[in-house]
């Protein structure tokens, strides 16, 4: 059992990982409606939670979307197949303790619930999800080689062709360009 602080775990004096107390595990229930813009139809829709402590189940329009646990990291769910234009209902069940609570035994207030922003966002079916830029500078910093790795996502179920252009700027001047 990891022990990070001199204080014991907040939920038991006799820890038995990964067991959590079922008779003393408060649950917070959250429910609200939201409007999905009609112009989001045909796009991927994601539900983002900035942080929820300690574990949660999520439902959209009565359908279970998923589960997440980690007190300080974001969680995202692809809710495209669960939402519709117009009014939708979001329900979240937050558990105070989870088996992850053993790893999160840090010196902080032991409060539970939704701790950061919750929002929806829409993206195209084919998109650049992320990229990584790696550079290798010469010893005198006068030249550099670089590599760009792109994470492309295609949710259409069929092959799509496209292109990307990369421009490296120095002020307003294009010093390198690649297709």
Region spans (language model):
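Ser/Thr- and Asn-enriched, surface-exposed coil loops between beta-strands
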Residues: 71, 140-144
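Accessory beta-strand-rich segments of carbohydrate-active enzymes
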Residues: 20-130, 154-156, 170-173
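Short beta-strand segments of immunoglobulin-like
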Residues: 133-139
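Predominantly extracellular/luminal regions of secreted and cell-surface proteins
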Residues: 1-6
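Surface-exposed, low-complexity/disordered Ser/Thr/Gly/Pro/Asn-rich loops and linkers
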Residues: 7-22
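Beta-strand-rich binding/interaction modules
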Residues: 143-179
